[in-house]
């Protein structure tokens, strides 16, 4: 059936058809890379959703796909309650989430560093918001304005950039927020884009 020309309906329908065709093309490319000779994982990964995502990324890269940026996700950090199990107890939901993050990233880094693909890979964490610097009444923390970032990979010079936050900055007058930003996340992204991926200014 032909698509009507010179009409809003026809334009929108053509967009849907083109999008469908592009999705099929991209799906074929992903499938080919995932199933390519040599597209394997060289280490074992934990049995978690985040680890499965990173495991797939490593396999796609080893399979020769040319994608420059991948995004994987882990949910559950909006810890308004049960962030820990009680006063003075560090165990709880936040500890479990950090364990999932660290073990998945550890496996991914070990995998990509098992051969030369790790020479060209940098990973970093980001979130849509941070947490306040005070516990609420439900053993959790509410939305805050700053948060740490983890940057990892063989090209990264390891260490801590910045200094410990000044917790005295968080008071009832500013709703227990830490306001001093040491590294703007946009600048971190820009640095990686320019210095590592070769993007222009």
Each model region followed by its residue ranges:
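Residue-level recognition of the N-termini of beta-strands and the immediately preceding loop/turn
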Residues: 68-70, 119-122
């Amino acid at each position: 059936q032909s698509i009507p020309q010179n009409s809003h309906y026809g334009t929108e329908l053509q967009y849907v058809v083109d999008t469908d065709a592009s999705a099929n093309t991209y799906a074929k490319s992903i499938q080919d890379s995932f199933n390519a000779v040599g597209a394997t994982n060289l280490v074992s990964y934990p049995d978690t959703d985040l680890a499965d995502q990173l495991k797939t990324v490593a396999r796609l890269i080893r399979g020769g796909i040319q994608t420059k940026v991948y995004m994987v996700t882990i949910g559950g950090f909006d810890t308004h309650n049960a962030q820990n199990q009680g006063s003075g107890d560090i165990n709880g939901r936040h500890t479990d989430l950090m364990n999932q993050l660290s073990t998945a990233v550890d496996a991914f880094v070990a995998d990509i560093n098992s051969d030369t693909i790790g020479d060209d890979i940098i990973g970093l964490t980001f979130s849509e918001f941070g947490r306040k610097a005070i516990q609420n009444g439900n053993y959790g923390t509410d939305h805050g304005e700053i948060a740490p970032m983890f940057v990892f990979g063989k090209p990264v010079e390891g260490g801590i950039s910045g200094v410990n936050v000044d917790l005295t900055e968080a008071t009832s007058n500013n709703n227990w927020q830490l306001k001093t930003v040491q590294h703007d996340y946009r600048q971190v992204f820009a640095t990686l884009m320019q210095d590592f991926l070769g993007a222009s200014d």
